[in-house]
Design a protein with these regions (language model features):
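Catalytic loop of short-chain dehydrogenase/reductase
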Residues: 1-59, 69, 80
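C-terminal helical subdomain
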Residues: 67-75, 79-136
Length: 136
């Protein structure tokens, strides 16, 4: 779904409705939905799809719409487990948001568990590294 550049709101909402129907019917496992954090994963799929649509809608209006996944982060959702602190995740998210407009893409999904996978934004990685070093 997310690879389809022409995905529509109706298609996203249809996917969510199908998931909910499958859950109510008790057949969601046999229908191939994610086995781990199922509802979370489906909601993030919908969020990413809507973000892509919004990015197209606001294109040319000096507004970027993106999603960001910091990776396995220590939060209440993970029971305090995770590879990264919420502070570290917030620093990278802030870095992405503060990229100059000409370097910040729109309609993208930023995945980050280690520096280097943030959509090749070298500027962001350099700033993040400087922030990390300043704390030590």
């Amino acid at each position: 779904m997310l690879l389809d550049e022409k995905v529509t709101e109706n298609e996203i909402e249809g996917m969510v409705r199908l998931f909910l129907e499958n859950v109510k019917s008790g057949i969601w496992r046999s229908q191939g939905w994610p086995a781990v954090w199922t509802d979370y994963a489906v909601s993030k799929l919908a969020l990413n799809g809507h973000s892509k649509i919004m990015a197209k809608l606001f294109k040319g209006r000096e507004l970027s719409v993106n999603c960001f996944c910091p990776g396995f982060t220590q939060t209440s959702m993970t029971g305090g487990k995770g590879k990264y602190t919420s502070q570290a995740a917030a620093e990278v998210a802030t870095c992405i948001v503060l990229l100059p407009p000409e370097k910040l893409l729109t309609g993208k999904f930023y995945v980050g568990s280690t520096p280097g996978v943030y959509s090749n934004h070298l500027h962001c990685l350099v700033v993040h590294e400087k922030m990390r070093r300043a704390k030590t």
